[in-house]
Regions:
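Charge-rich, low-hydrophobicity low-complexity segments
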Residues: 2-124
């Protein structure tokens, strides 16, 4: 007869997940024009010069330069156009609270910046 203590059930010891903090560098697409029909072809042209550069890249949409009302921004069109280019918008930065709320209603939450924004940028 074994005198070893019974082992606890493995299933009760395993955690189904763990949440951990992490920092990531993300590209910000600063919108200088609110119209997807202007932005999407321009970014598509730029990234065709470097195929695969942003393929499936998560990108944050910068709203701080827009001088229009949130109702004028076609967030669904912008999101759809970027995804067709295989660029994945994951959130927003900057802009008014109304603009951020409009973006949030289409699945783009505000992303908090941990550091001062980098001034290096790629322009069309």
């Amino acid at each position: 007869m074994s005198s070893a203590a019974p082992k606890p059930d493995q299933a009760t010891r395993l955690e189904p997940f763990r949440l951990r903090g992490a920092n990531f560098n993300l590209l910000v697409l600063r919108l200088l024009d609110h119209r997807p029909e202007a932005v999407v072809p321009a970014i598509g042209d730029q990234f065709r010069r470097a195929p695969g550069f942003l393929r499936f890249a998560p990108i944050v949409i910068g709203l701080g330069d827009l001088q229009v009302s949130p109702a004028e921004v076609d967030f669904p069109g912008l999101i759809k156009g970027l995804r067709e280019l295989e660029i994945m918008p994951i959130g927003t930065t900057g802009g008014t609270s109304e603009m951020r709320n409009a973006a949030l209603s289409y699945g783009l939450p505000p992303v908090r910046s941990a550091l001062k924004p980098n001034t290096a940028e790629l322009s069309a």
